[in-house]
Amino acid sequence: MAGTQACSATRFSCPPHFTEMSPDSEPSRFSLEALTGPDTELWLIQAPADFAPQCLNGRRVPLSGSKTVKGKLDGKKHRYRVFTSSPQAREATLLASSSEAGGRLTCAPAPSGSLRIMEGPQEYLLSRVPLQLIPTSLPPQIPAGLRPRFSAFGGSPPVTGPGSASALRSPTSGKRKSTRKGTDASSDTQEAVNRHGAMEVKTALGNLGVSVKKRKRYFMQEEMEAKTMEPVAELPVPSATSSKKRKKSKGTETSQVEHTEPVAQTEPPEGTFLFPTKKRKRQKEADGTEEVDGIVADSQPQVIVEAQEETILLSPTKKRRKEKRQNLGMEAEMGPPGVLMVTEHSEHGLQAEVALVSPKKTKKKKGKRVGETEAALPDDFEPQGALAPSKKKERGARL
């Protein structure tokens, strides 16, 4: 049975692309004893068929990574690319002859790594074949009839031309403006209602369609009228002259108050009822004129401003007529309750007083007689000043 098993065992057959060699009697350098030495390492090298190991004599080969190695053989330069890799388990199994086994092949230890040698691009090929240039990318070209759009998604497209301003305006812009105007008008009318407390103003202005500026002016005019009406209610005689007349009257008021001697109207105490006559006037010219001077000093602040402004613009003849009318009207009104003592100075009487009495003595007498007149007058006395003749009359009387 054993013989039959031995006869049936197949012999080792040489694989394809390998040649069978008979072992030499001399020990080979790839014997098992040489490979297992302490100073030797076993590396598996894979190279092309036409590779000549002599071209890499004296060259350093990397044991990790990859490197391009140049070699020279028979005057020709060769370039090889060497790749190294660590051995893997059961990647390759080496069989070596052993002298101990009588020259038979035995399994050798596993190699330390593997080297793969590949042919690189040769220099003569690189020098002869020109390199192909990579074309640079051209900038994008916009075809004719198209326009670039540099706006975000949902934005309005750019519009050029005369109609750009109208096209850019959104259809809702007019509505917004109208609503804003409506809110402004309503706020103005509400303020007016709060100030004056009248809801009719809002409805009237809204129906007329007055603009906002006109409404503001209307309300400002109402405020000014309300302010001006307050002092009118307190004063008995409002001033109706213009601004120009007021400016002229300011300069002349001081001079007229000093020089003029207006006619004083007095009310005597109850029980005496006297009528003004020419005889009494002439009798009391000497004594009454001095008393009138004291009364005039007290009645000067109550001179009516409006009458003074009117006398500046009137001629002297018209002034006299107007004074007579005023005196007659005042006498008609004040006639029944009491008697009005009107003192009028004639030109001859004034000239006589100026000639007899010196100005220094009159000043001293005025201070004394003012106190006498105040004591003689009743408690209810209220002097009312009327307008006196103009400056021309006074100058003529003093001359």
Curated annotation (Swiss-Prot):
Region of interest (Disordered), residue spans: 1-28, 148-200, 230-297, 314-336, 359-399
Main location as per UniProt: nucleus
Keyword entries, A-Z: Acetylation, Nucleus, Phosphoprotein
Gene Ontology annotations for the cellular component aspect, listed alphabetically: nucleolus; RNA polymerase I complex
Residue numbers of Phosphothreonine PTMs: 277
Keyword Acetylation in record: yes
Comp. bias intervals (Basic residues): 390-399
Modification Phosphoserine occurs at: 137, 173, 299
Entry keyword Cell inner membrane: no
Top-level taxon: Eukaryota
Compositionally biased intervals (Polar residues): 1-11
Subcellular location: Nucleus, Nucleolus
Modified residues (Phosphotyrosine): 80
PTM annotation (N-acetylmethionine): residues: 1
Record-level GO BP terms: rRNA transcription; transcription by RNA polymerase I
Assembly notes: Component of the RNA polymerase I (Pol I) complex consisting of 13 subunits: a ten-subunit catalytic core composed of POLR1A/RPA1, POLR1B/RPA2, POLR1C/RPAC1, POLR1D/RPAC2, POLR1H/RPA12, POLR2E/RPABC1, POLR2F/RPABC2, POLR2H/RPABC3, POLR2K/RPABC4 and POLR2L/RPABC5; a mobile stalk subunit POLR1F/RPA43 protruding from the core and additional subunits homologous to general transcription factors POLR1E/RPA49 and POLR1G/RPA34. Forms a heterodimer with POLR1E/RPA49. Part of Pol I pre-initiation complex (PIC), in which Pol I core assembles with RRN3 and promoter-bound UTBF and SL1/TIF-IB complex.
Additional notes on this entry: It is in an antisense orientation to and overlaps the gene of the DNA repair enzyme ERCC1. This gene overlap is conserved in human, suggesting an important biological function.
Assigned protein family: Belongs to the eukaryotic RPA34 RNA polymerase subunit family.
Task of the protein: DNA-dependent RNA polymerase catalyzes the transcription of DNA into RNA using the four ribonucleoside triphosphates as substrates. Component of RNA polymerase I which synthesizes ribosomal RNA precursors. Involved in UBTF-activated transcription, presumably at a step following PIC formation.
Protein name: DNA-directed RNA polymerase I subunit RPA34
Native source organism of the sequence: Mus musculus
